[in-house]
Amino acid sequence: MDNHLAQGDPKTPDAMTNYARLADLPVTKCRDAAALAAQSFDAVVDALYGTGFHGSLRPAGLAACALMNRQRESGAFVLAVDLPSGINTDTGEAAEGAVRADLTVTFDSCKPLHTAPSSAPFCGEIVCADIGIRDEWHPAGLAQL
């Protein structure tokens, strides 16, 4: 199995720590977008942006999302981690070029974007994974799948 990392270097401390862990995994860092775009994949994992995303996609993010969407159009299965990149978690507003996933695996509970009419179609099937957060720690009115 080939794994490719298609976004630039991480900027936050947590992202830097996890990025360093890649040294022990079979991951190819691809800085040549044209070379990556020329390949076809059976599956794509979208973990580009997280719950803090808002506004428009930056040029590199827009290009990465476009690549994932083209791969999906060519038959690749797209799995989004927590949410498809390019969607505001709280409002469901989808930026131009947001990823369209076949499956979105979210953690603990459904977020507003998973049910908002503007963004739910981008999620595909939604699976909520239990990660052990106790019920009493949930805010009132939190949606559960």
Task: Give, region by region, the residue ranges found by the protein language model.
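A cross-family phosphate/adenosyl-ligand binding-site feature
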Residues: 1-44, 49, 54-59
